[in-house]
Regions:
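Conserved glycine-rich cofactor-binding loop
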Residues: 17-18
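Conserved glycine-rich Rossmann-like NAD(P)H-binding loop of the short-chain dehydrogenase/reductase
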Residues: 33-50
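Rossmann-fold cofactor-recognition segment
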Residues: 58-75
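Conserved NAD(P)H cofactor-binding loop of Rossmann-fold oxidoreductase domains
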Residues: 99-107
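Catalytic Tyr-X3-Lys loop
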Residues: 102, 112-131, 175
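Amphipathic alpha-helical dimer-interface segment in Rossmann-like NAD(P)H-dependent oxidoreductases
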Residues: 124-146, 184
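Catalytic loop of short-chain dehydrogenase/reductase
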Residues: 142, 147-174, 179-184, 195-199, ...
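C-terminal helical subdomain
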Residues: 193-196, 211-259
Length: 259
């Protein structure tokens, strides 16, 4: 087994009830050694329970905790209640994966994005909850002996502009910059922004059907685009392997299609 995963590990994974988050939970669950813990969060309780059963089927020697949370209404107190029961002395690796996110209002072009309430709601889920949970995570697990690894699930749209997905582009770009700053300020942390490529998820389908921009809708549904679609299992397996190899600079971004 790889050195990275062959340790008692505590994993916190957001957006774990479906799609990439669910698959990632299962793939990581397969690798965790005995006495490890994986904490799953999402709004959908049924989805979380399904994920838990899928992990248990692969590995019954780890503890799995599920928390139904609304990241649109999150704060430090909520996250502190989740991490408070964890005995931080038990683990050699603490892994936080920020997977939860939303696409935003696809009916708004950039010139239409003028509603502070809509901006605040979007950024609460996609940025503020991320920075808040990260702060709580680092405060709780502050041992010098255990490694702390943070993965920010990102997207090509964090570095490339696309029409009608302004909220999503801004959210992903701001998250990436936050983690670059965090890595610069804390060089001992293991921080990675990982872009899984275009994976056929509910979010991708929503964008391809409901984007206000006709060109984007046609691009996402074109035959040419289909050759670039990544299977969710492949995207998750690559992340697991990247973490195991650890050949990246902390704070950097890696895309699924990178060589």
């Amino acid at each position: 087994m790889n050195e990275f995963w062959n340790r008692r590990t505590c994993v916190i994974l957001t957006g774990a009830s479906k799609g990439i988050g669910q698959c990632l939970a299962v793939e990581i669950g397969k690798l965790l050694v005995s006495e490890s813990t994986i904490i799953l969060t999402a709004r959908d309780t049924n989805g979380l329970e399904k994920t838990k059963k899928m992990i248990n089927k692969e590995n019954s020697d780890i503890l799995i905790e599920c928390y139904s949370v609304d990241l649109y209404n999150s704060d430090a107190t909520m996250f502190e209640k989740i991490v408070e029961p964890i005995d931080s002395t038990k683990y050699e690796l603490f892994l936080l994966i920020h997977n939860a996110g939303s696409i935003g209002n696809l009916n708004h072009l950039a010139a239409d994005m003028n509603e502070p309430d809509e901006w605040n709601k979007y950024m609460m889920l996609n940025l503020y909850s991320v920075t808040c949970l990260t702060s709580v995570f680092l405060s709780k697990f502050n041992s010098d002996t255990a490694e702390k690894c943070i993965v920010n699930m990102t997207s090509l749209l964090g570095i490339e502009p696309y029409k009608s997905v302004g909220y999503y582009c801004v959210g992903k770009a701001s998250r990436e910059m936050f983690f670059r700053v965090l890595a610069l300020e804390n060089p001992t942390l293991n921080i990675l922004s990982y872009s899984p490529g275009p994976v056929m998820t509910d979010m991708y389908t929503n964008m391809s059907l409901n984007s206000k921009d006709k060109d984007l809708r046609e691009q996402l549904t074109s035959e040419q685009q289909q050759q670039y679609i990544v299977k969710v299992e492949d995207a998750c397996q690559k992340l697991v392997n990247i973490l195991a190899m650890k050949s990246y600079k902390t704070g950097s971004r890696i895309d699924y299609h990178d060589k």
